Each structure stands twice: as structure tokens, then as C-alpha cells.
A protein has these predicted regions:
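Flexible coil segments in periplasmic/lumen-exposed cytochrome c-class electron-transfer proteins
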Residues: 25-31, 41-43, 50, 82-196, ...
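Gly/Gly-Pro-rich "capping" loops immediately C-terminal to redox-active cysteine motifs
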Residues: 31-36, 46-84
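Short, conserved, GDST-rich strand-edge loop motifs in beta-rich repeat architectures
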Residues: 191-212, 256-271, 309-312, 356-385, ...
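Repeated scaffold domains used in trafficking and secretory/extracellular systems
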Residues: 175-183, 238-245, 291-302, 339-347, ...
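A short beta-strand motif characteristic of beta-propeller blades
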Residues: 168-174, 226-235, 284-289, 328-335, ...
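Short loop/turn segments that connect beta-strands within beta-propeller blades
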Residues: 222-225, 279-283, 323-327, 394-398, ...
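Short coil/turn segments that connect the beta-strands within blades of beta-propeller domains
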Residues: 188-190, 249-251, 302-304, 350-352, ...
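Blade-level signature of beta-propeller repeat domains, shared across WD40, Kelch, NHL, RCC1
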Residues: 515-581
Length: 581
């Protein structure tokens, strides 16, 4: 049977079982057409807008007939979502066409339905048989596993049974004088913090750009967006910045450190990887502690700080909890117990679960496996990769409670909704998925911009904002894609910074802040109008990663209210608790 036959079979199958006749009133057809037009998945409004005037798809106000629509089913592959999900019958198409005419203000001639039915029957006579092609053994093998359903149906648990908790013997290897405060916080005000590195991309900046040689901690005013102060860290403490993190009480910031120092104070090539603890007022390091891995991301977790890591030492952890009071690694999880490599980790707003983005081993040594795999997909070396998945960790028992494979490669980022019903996963393979947390069911998967990385929900959780970094592809992405969270369709593609990396909703729920580690800037968007408000240049355009907001109450008591992991300390615009500043 030809492709056209299969499509037309769907269209005409309802003729015998759908007893709608020409006597049905025009009003009834229009009403039925409206229901179909606005169906959530597969409905016309998704692409053509609720009025039919066009969104991503063109305007329909010319009044397409049912035959025009069927022609698009055959000729336009994008329309397959309609035939698969809406599955319209002959009478459905008649109703849709009448409804579109009502939207366009065109005449609703009672003779049209009968005319259209005759045209649809005539259309069948134009069908031609589909040609048959020989399939190779490779193609047959690929067909057996090409659908995501086969991943779910054959999934086997990767993690060990029981607790995956392990410990790491952290050591304090450096203490430093905190110095003098660089600014004086005011009661009732909110401040943003940013760790800034030395690895911006000169090619996307101005002629003669010279990168900084020192990492910095920057603090600014959340209301005015202006930088207040910054401090350059000693070059001997330099490493590659990938995150900004803060203790729950807003007193201490954390930054990636080099390997532990040798006798002369320079990093020891054979030493353990370290992290720096910095005073949030003086902006200077006070402690250097071994953590057994190069720091990647960090976020508040209960009264501790949760980190995930890049390169692990032999005894290092893929994720760990850090005690800001005792300055020690309490423990965490090793990759080997998870059955794959931990990339990033994300808690829900109540800290009830930790969701680890997991990578299959073997595409490169150690934790580089996922990045290497997806890079080779973009470069054409690989046609497919082994599955990536989400591991659901109970932080009270430290058992892996569930594993959910995802339809994409190398998950970078995840956002859990305020109801803790769904997790939005953003993949380097230029797609994102909405996953039901109760059972791992994929609600939708939608396309993003090239090589996405970070993401954030808007305040009412109707939009997922995604930073299109170019991860794995070319690292020159410069857009922000916005997806409708109900159906996963893109609604906007915004101009952004080169290598836009993280995007976060501000604590007031009104702005989206996007950090660029290519330009060394922060772009701030109005979350409602989507307009770019200001750009904030980091000192010397050092690369910007992550964001933290710290609020001081009327008594001058500090609290971290937002970081890249979630909102904290009672602030959450999605729960009706925005911070007014």
C-alpha cells in the first residue's frame, strides 16, 4: 500500500462508521470543527494560531478545502503529527474547513459540505502504488531498535540495589585572610553574584580583546542590574569556571579551584582537585578544600550545598553534599554504583528527590563519554548512541528509586515543575522532553535551537526557556528558544549571546537572566514581553557561569533565594511567592 493510500485510509476510514450526513447543520459542523482545530496535540491551532491567522505555520484565512488539507498531509511531512494524533476522518476534515471559514469571515455556504465530500471521494482515484525497495541487513537491524519504544521495553536497571552513598576524605589545604568588605549590603535589598572565568571566546568579542588571567567573584544590584564590586582571585588559584554557588545563608560563595598546592604554592599536578570558599562580602577566598574532582555545578540543598563534578580523581565522587559549617565533603555517589556516569543533578523545590542526568560509558575516557558521543553525532562519526537516562535518588536512603530512559542524547539540564509532577530535560541533541515523574512516561519531545544547555520555566510554568549554546555542535549558538510546556511546540526564538549557557528566572518572576561564557555578558529579558532589557558586561568580559541571588531582610539577615538549582528560603514565583525588590 502506498504512503498516500495509508494516509487516505485514515482520512476515509470514518465514512462508514461516522454517521454524520449532509443534513447536519452548518452550525454543528462549525462547532465540531472548532473542537478539532483546538485539540491540544495535533490540532491546527498549535501551528496556525487560535484564530487561524498563522504562528509557525501560515495563515489559513484563504479557506482551505478538505482536499487542500489532504494534499498537505501527503506533501508536507510536518503534517504527520496531525494524521498520527488527530487522526481526522472525512467528516472531521469537512468540519475543520467550515470552522476555518468561520474564523476568516468567509461565506458558510450550506452546499459546500456536499461538494467537499464528492471531491474527497474523487481524490482516492489519483492514488498510485508505493514502490518497494530492498532493505540491507544493516537497515533491518536498525529498524528493530530505531523507535524509542524499544528502549523503554528492553530497559534494564543500571544502578546497584540498596544505598549508593559513598564517602570522600576531604581536607582543608589552604586558609586565607578574608580581607575587607567590598560592599555593604542594605536591609531589604537583593543582590546577584556571578563567578567569572578566563575562557571567553575572543572571536566573538572585539578586536584586540585580551582575556583576563584571574577568576573573579562579582556582585551586583538585582534591581538596577549594575555591578557593585568584584575581586580578582590569585592566579595560583585559577581553574576553569563552570558554576556559581552559595551557601543557604548567603554568607559563603563557592568557586572551582585548581589541584591542591605544592610546597611553593603552585598547583601540584598529582594533587587532589580543590574548591574555594569565598566570603560573600569581601569576595575573597577564605578556605581551599580538596573535593576529589573538578567542580561543575552547585546549588543549595536543604541546609547543605549539592555539587556535581567533571573530572574525578580515583576516589572522587560524581555528586556530593558539602557542609558549609564544617567545610567538609559529607559524602555522595560514585559513578560505578550508578551503572553510568553522572553528568548533572537537580533537586525539586522541596529537596525530596535528586534527579541525576546519566551517561553511558565508553565513548571517551571517564566522564567525557557523553560529550564525545554527542559531538560525534553532530560530526557524522556515529549514527546512533546508547541510551541516556534519568536516575531518581532518594536523599534520605540514598537509594536509586527509578530510572527513566529519555529520547535524546546527553541530557544537560533539568527543571522540575512546582507540582513535582513533571521534569523537563534538555538534551545536547537539540531537543527537550517533558517527562512524567510518577512513571517516566514521555509527555512530549520537541525541537530546540542548536546544542541547548540551560533552561528555566517562567513564573506560571507555561513556558520553558532554553539557552541554545551550540553544545556539542560548534559552541557558537546565540539564541534562546521558548517552548510551550503543554505541547512542546516552539513559540519564540530570541536573539541572544554567543555561547549562551544558563538561563534563569529571577526571584521577582519578571525577568530571565541568560549568561554567556562566550561573550562574558549577562543578557536580561523581560519574561512577558520577551524584550532584551540590558546587557551586563563582566569585568574584562570574563566568561559568566550560573547565577545566585541573595536577599537581605529588614533585619539585615541574608538568605540565598535563587541559584541554578531552584528557588530557596521561601521564595518561589511559581508558587505565588515572588520576591519584591
Amino acid at each position: 500500500m502506498s504512503i498516500r493510500s495509508r494516509l487516505l485510509l485514515v482520512v476515509f476510514a470514518g465514512l462508514s462508521c461516522n454517521a454524520v450526513t449532509a443534513q447536519d447543520s452548518v452550525d454543528a459542523l462549525v462547532e465540531r470543527g472548532g473542537e478539532l482545530f483546538h485539540t491540544t496535540v495535533g490540532g491546527c491551532a498549535t501551528c496556525h494560531g487560535p484564530t487561524g491567522e498563522g504562528l509557525v505555520g501560515p495563515s489559513l484565512h484563504f479557506g482551505p478545502s478538505p482536499v487542500n488539507i489532504v494534499d498537505q498531509f501527503v506533501a508536507n511531512p510536518i503534517m504527520i503529527v496531525v494524521t498520527e494524533n488527530l487522526n481526522p476522518t472525512n467528516e472531521d476534515l469537512v468540519a475543520i474547513s467550515m470552522y476555518i471559514r468561520s474564523l476568516a469571515g468567509l461565506e458558510l455556504d450550506p452546499a459546500l459540505p456536499s461538494q467537499w465530500r464528492t471531491e474527497l471521494v474523487a481524490l482516492e482515484s489519483l492514488d498510485t502504488e508505493e514502490q518497494e525497495f530492498r532493505r540491507t541487513e544493516y537497515e533491518l537491524a536498525m529498524e528493530r531498535v530505531q523507535r524509542f519504544d524499544t528502549v523503554v521495553e528492553t530497559w534494564e536497571r543500571r544502578a546497584i540495589e540498596g544505598s549508593v552513598w559513598s564517602e570522600y576524605p576531604s581536607r582543608i589545604v589552604g586558609r586565607f585572610d578574608a580581607g575587607e568588605p567590598k560592599f555593604t549590603p542594605e536591609p531589604g535589598k537583593t543582590y546577584w553574584y556571578e563567578n567569572v572565568g578566563t575562557t571567553s571566546s575572543p572571536s566573538v568579542l572585539f578586536d584586540g580583546y585580551v582575556p583576563p588571567t584571574q577568576n573573579r567573584l562579582v556582585v551586583g544590584d538585582a534591581a538596577t542590574h549594575e555591578i557593585i564590586a568584584s575581586y580578582a582571585i590569585d592566579e595560583n588559584l585559577r581553574s576553569v569556571v563552570h558554576t556559581s554557588a552559595m551557601s543557604p545563608d548567603g554568607r559563603w560563595a563557592y568557586m572551582v579551584g585548581p589541584r591542591e598546592p605544592s610546597a611553593d604554592g603552585t598547583p601540584n599536578p598529582a594533587g587532589a582537585w580543590t574548591m574555594l570558599k569565598l566570603d560573600a562580602l569581601t569576595l575573597q577566598p577564605v578556605v581551599q578544600v580538596t573535593i576529589g574532582a573538578r567542580l561543575h555545578h552547585g546549588q543549595v540543598f536543604r541546609d547543605k550545598v549539592l555539587f556535581d563534578t567533571f573530572v574525578r580523581d580515583p576516589d572522587g565522587l560524581g555528586l556530593f553534599l558539602y557542609d558549609p559549617e564544617t567545610d567538609e565533603v559529607l559524602g555522595g555517589v560514585r559513578d560505578v554504583d550508578m551503572g553510568g556516569f553522572i553528568y548533572t543533578v537537580w533537586p525539586d523545590h522541596d529537596y525530596e528527590r535528586i534527579y541525576a542526568m546519566m551517561e553511558p560509558a565508553g565513548y571517551a575516557p571517564g566522564r567525557s563519554t557523553g560529550m564525545r558521543g554527542v559531538t560525534q553525532i553532530y560530526h557524522g562519526e556515529y549514527q546512533a548512541l546508547r541510551p541516556f537516562w534519568i536516575a531518581v535518588i532518594n536523599p534520605d536512603t540514598w537509594e536509586v528509586e527509578a530510572e527513566y530512559p529519555i529520547p535524546g542524547y546527553r541530557p544537560n539540564w533539568a527543571v522540575i515543575d512546582s507540582a513535582k509532577e513533571h521534569i523537563y530535560v534538555i538534551n545536547s541533541s537539540s531537543n527537550a522532553s517533558k517527562v512524567r515523574l510518577s512513571d517516566g512516561e514521555i509527555i512530549w519531545t520537541g525541537g530546540t535551537g542548536i546544542g541547548p544547555y540551560g533552561g528555566s520555566l517562567n513564573a506560571d510554568e507555561t513556558e520553558l526557556w532554553i539557552a541554545d549554546k551550540g553544545e556539542g555542535a560548534h559552541h557558537l549558538g546565540r539564541t534562546v528558544t521558548i517552548l510551550n510546556t503543554e505541547d512542546g511546540h516552539a513559540t519564540h526564538s530570541l536573539y541572544g549571546a554567543y555561547k549562551v549557557d544558563h538561563v534563569l528566572l529571577s526571584p521577582n518572576g519578571e525577568e530571565m537572566w541568560a549568561t554567556s561564557n562566550g561573550e562574558g555578558r549577562i543578557y536580561i529579558y523581560d519574561a512577558k514581553s520577551k524584550e532584551l532589557i540590558p546587557k551586563i558586561d563582566m569585568p574584562e568580559n570574563g566568561d559568566a557561569h550560573g547565577l545566585i541571588w541573595v536577599h537581605y531582610d529588614e533585619n539585615g539577615q541574608a538568605a540565598t533565594v535563587r541559584d541554578q538549582g531552584n528557588f530557596h528560603n521561601g521564595v518561589n514565583p511559581s508558587l505565588g511567592r515572588p520576591l519584591d525588590y
